Amino acid sequence: MRIGQYQLKNCLIAAPMAGVTDRPFRSLCYDMGAGMTVSEMLSSNPQVWQTDKSRLRMVHSDELGIRSVQIAGSDPVDMAAAAKINADSGAQIIDINMGCPAKKVNKKLAGSALLRHPDLVAEILSAVVNAVDVPVTLKIRTGWSPDERNCVEIAKLAERCGIQALTIHGRTRECLFKGEAEYDSIRTVKQNVSIPIIANGDITDPLKARAVLDYTGADALMIGRAAQGRPWIFREIQHYLDTGELLPPLPIAEVQQIMQKHVRELHDFYGQGKGTRIARKHVSWYLKEHAPDDQFRRSFNAIEDASEQLEALEAYFENFLRK
């Protein structure tokens, strides 16, 4: 699949997830087989551009793979400026968020709230496309509510504005993450536009990935929550798409190696204090199926020191492997 001048190594993309897809996680997903990763959402509000939080979220020119940054906002001028700043800082693709269902985002008429205002959508898309020399992509939901599904209208509008790929999450804003994603809307969009379509929502395993590609005709898949604590899902899916065979479960020793490397990189990237706090949620996701009683996770979450976190993980796996 191509986005503008960029050829992805495969059709699997790691979704932008606030508080999750930081640089260490993006690098890990890329190493584990993702064809591209997208940064967590960056606000277009100029008042926050120079904060430590925003600087950590930006991509840098030394990152591996195609560097895509997602921006969010409702002011066309601010969005264009944010796109230019990120492109100048190393972003090779700018992704526009019109799919986030969070209330705090929607209250500012950003994220999926924009789907109710096609005229403003067109202004924002045109402003961003005209502001940068890199490809611009868009991520949306199928609409505001089941009674207001307008993804086909938005897709056609996006194509006219110069958007070079469109990701669609198979739920409306009203649905949040409840129930199951539906793919009929994605299939219909694919039949009505010529730009690449990326299907998103509930793609949890290789069989589901194959089924969604076949049913929707999508050019690529975007995988989000299923990669939390299981970044090797990209490798599993790609192997199945290539061979029709499922890989065996990842050996626990390899899970340990991946997790400990990830935790070390979080410590290095954020520093000991913030790094240890952020590591807690990732370790919880990794160990979901291995520590169902939560006992280890509770004790791990009380650890404040980075080296103690790594020692605790080492001891946990030693005990686990002895069982």
Swiss-Prot record:
Reaction(s) catalysed (UniProt annotation): a 5,6-dihydrouridine in tRNA + NAD(+) = a uridine in tRNA + NADH + H(+); a 5,6-dihydrouridine in tRNA + NADP(+) = a uridine in tRNA + NADPH + H(+)
Protein purpose: Catalyzes the synthesis of 5,6-dihydrouridine (D), a modified base found in the D-loop of most tRNAs, via the reduction of the C5-C6 double bond in target uridines.
Cofactor: FMN
tRNA-binding in keyword set: yes
CDD domains for the chain: DUS_like_FMN
Residues given in the record as FMN binding sites: 16-18, 70, 139, 200-202, 224-225
Pfam family, one: Dus
Protein name: tRNA-dihydrouridine synthase B
InterPro entries: Aldolase_TIM, DUS-like_FMN-bd, DUS_fam, DusB, DusB-like, tRNA-dHydroUridine_Synthase_C, tRNA_hU_synthase_CS
Family per similarity comment: Belongs to the Dus family. DusB subfamily.
Gene3D superfamilies reported for this sequence: Aldolase class I, Putative flavin oxidoreducatase, domain 2
Active site per database record: 100
Organism this protein belongs to: Proteus vulgaris
GO MF terms held by the record: flavin adenine dinucleotide binding; FMN binding; tRNA binding; tRNA dihydrouridine synthase activity
